[in-house]
Structure formats: C-alpha cells, structure tokens
Amino acid sequence: MKADLPSRRILNTVLPGILVVMWSTGFIGAKFGLPYAEPATFLAYRFTVVAVILVVVAFLMRAPWPKSAKAYFHLFIVGLLLQAVNLGCVFFAIDFGVDASVTALINGLQPALVAIIAISVLGERTSGWQWLGFVLGLGGVAMVVWRKLELGVGTPLGMSLSVCALLGLSIGVIYQKKFCEDMDLRTGTAMQTAAAAVAMWIVSAGWETGVVDWTGEFIFAFVWLSVVLSLGAIILLLYLIRCGQAARVSSLFFLVPPVAAIFSYFMFNETFGAVAMIGMLVAVIGVGLVNRNP
C-alpha cells in the first residue's frame, strides 16, 4: 500500500493536466468535423449517442433518478444552457469562420463571468483580485476579437455567437449550482444531454438539411467528441473530484485557451499576431486571477 502512494500522488498531479488537454480538443474536434456535417446535425447525433450511453451506464450502476417533475425541469434547463446553447453556439461560430482558438478563448472567460454573476445570484463574495481578473479577461478577449475581425478572420455574427456560448455556459453553471447541486452526476448528466439532443434535432429538422458525409475524418471527430471527450472527460472529472482534486482542475482550466491555440496552429495553421497574442496573454492572466486562492 505504501509503495502505491507515490504513484497515486504522481497520477493525481498529472491527471488534471490531461483533463485540460482533453477539454481543449473539443474546440479542435468541432472544426475538424464541421466540413462534413452542419452544426446542429453534428451535435444532435453526438448528444444522442452520449445520452444513450449515459442512460445505460446509469441503469447498470443503479444510479438514483430524480424524484420530481421539478427536478427534471431544472435538469432540462441546465442541459439546454450548458450543452445546447453553449456547444451549439460554439459549433455555429466555428461554422461562420471564427477560429477554434478564439472560441476557446471567449469560452475561457466562464470562471470570471460566473464569479461576477454569483455576487447577485448566489450572494457569494468576490475579491478585488477577482474583479481585476474579470476586467483583464474581458479586455484581453476584446483585443483578440477586434484584431481577428480587423484581419477578416470570422464575422461579427460568428463572434456574437461565441459570446452567446459564453453566456449559456456561465448562466448554466450558476443555474446548476442553485437548483441542481444535489443531482446524481450519472443520471443528471444523462437527462441534461438528452434535453440538448432534442433541442439540436429540432434545430436540425427546421433549419438544416440533416445530411452527413460519413468520411473517416468525420467519424474520427465524432467518436472523439462523443466517446473520448464527452464520456472520458466526465469519468476523469468524477475521479478527480472523488480524489479531492476538483480545485486543482478549476485552477488549471484557464490554460484551455492557449492549449487550444497550440492545437489550432499545428492542425489548422491558425496564427495569432502580436496584438492577439498579447490579448490572449492578458485574458489568461485575468482568468488566472479569478481562480487564485484568496
């Protein structure tokens, strides 16, 4: 047992970083697969597969299900915000030409925005450092967005969708903390994903052709996003929470945008000029300040 302790410590040190890298690939996978399927159709298939797997896992593990209609309602709202609105807007933004790294950067403001929203909604206290971090994060993102639009990379609509994705994610996190804090992660996530799947099928049926080109590239992106990322990241996150590593994961999530930018550079040749790089650095520092321990 004692011999296993150093290995466990090393594992618990490395795994949060692995989770951050996995999370970063979500934006890359979206851009990789979108040439072969429309955004809502892509997500409809993805959410359906993930929801079915999660429901099966929940039944096999005999996980407790919500006991009231109100509990289901709250789970559905969170699913729509965290998955349908957030990921839906991310996918549509990338489809409108926004760099994957830029969508990751804007989404990366979530801890800062949640900290500010939590003041009025949850009554949580926010320090001066967190306010400074929020201002720096917002300013850094504004620099990147302005520079990218000036260079003709992306469109105002695409950038607006990225902001909508951030709002959906941030409001969803607050809503879940207020109304779904006691949910079972297995059944709760299954219901949230099912709600997002229904929403995406409605969008797909109403505004898209529903055609998917099942190429090798698309299948790889689909399997990666649906199984490796959606399920693997959830399992890894649950393990880290059980091991008491949730705080470390939260403190490292501000690294998602630069990691996504590195992936984007090598896979799609997405580049950052001097102004955009400074903006990303300022934004990352800002989110890091929001996450710092008081």
Where are these regions (language model features)?
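Membrane-interface interhelical linkers
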Residues: 1-18, 51-78, 91-96, 120-132, ...
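Hydrophobic residues within alpha-helical transmembrane segments
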Residues: 14, 18, 44-49, 77, ...
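Juxtamembrane helix-loop-helix junctions in multi-pass membrane proteins
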Residues: 21-52, 171-196, 209, 214-216
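Hydrophobic residues within membrane-embedded alpha-helical segments of Major Facilitator Superfamily
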Residues: 22, 29, 49, 81-82, ...
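Hydrophobic/small/kink-forming positions within alpha-helical transmembrane segments
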Residues: 24, 28, 55, 79-84, ...
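Structural signature of hydrophobic alpha-helical transmembrane segments
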Residues: 38-50, 94-110, 155-167, 217-227
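Helix-helix packing/entry segments at the starts of transmembrane helices
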Residues: 43-45, 102-109, 175-198, 230-266
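Hydrophobic transmembrane alpha-helices of multi-pass small-molecule transport proteins
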Residues: 54, 117, 126-148, 166, ...
